[in-house]
Amino acid sequence: MESINYQILKRSEKKLLGLFFDYFQHVIKMHETLNKLLCEADVTKREKLIQAIYEMEDFSNKSEFKLINESIWAISKNSPLTNHLRLTITIIMCSRDLERICDYANNLTKFVKHYQHLDVSIFSKLVNLHKSVLNNLKQTFASLQDKEKPLTIQFENVTKILTEFEQQYRVVLTEYYDKVKDEKLSDRIFLIDLILSVKHIERINDYCYNIIKAFLFVKNPEVFN
């Protein structure tokens, strides 16, 4: 009986992880589309990319609800053991992180739409920062699927990426802050919006860190003792 229950739990885990990784791939695709938008000079193409991202945001909300519902159902139905319960709760927590990462893509898209009358070159520093977090998103996804390399190493890598990004991010922020002091009011409003967009990008890296940390805790809880 115990063996049968274990098999049921493992099947449930596999299903939840499958849904989670499908959702994660959608998040990456959404941010790849956003990066294209930040680089796109053609207004008509920009409009199509904006619409695509809005639709992806809607799909993201539905994916999160589905994943949470499946997770709650798995808990109520299967009476999971400690390790299985820990994984299921982690999937719920990380699905919230993925949803927030999509929210930031949506917010950045609204920013681009509001200022799409401006030359696309004005977003150049934003593009570079966003490419950095997009790469981190992809690395985080790959790390969670890599069964050979210990997550402790991936955790160290993400921590290093965050430190390097922090330096790059602060340089850009300082430059924008300095400009705010000197510009006229209309330009100042744009620069403040630009600074907020930089902050959105920074938060994406934080959520990548949270996701790796959460899955590391599932496998090696003693790391955080």
Curated annotation (Swiss-Prot):
InterPro entries: P_transport_PhoU, PhoU-like_sf, PhoU_dom. Coiled coil: none annotated. GO terms for biological process: intracellular phosphate ion homeostasis; negative regulation of phosphate metabolic process. It comes from the Bacteria. This is Uncharacterized protein MG409 homolog.
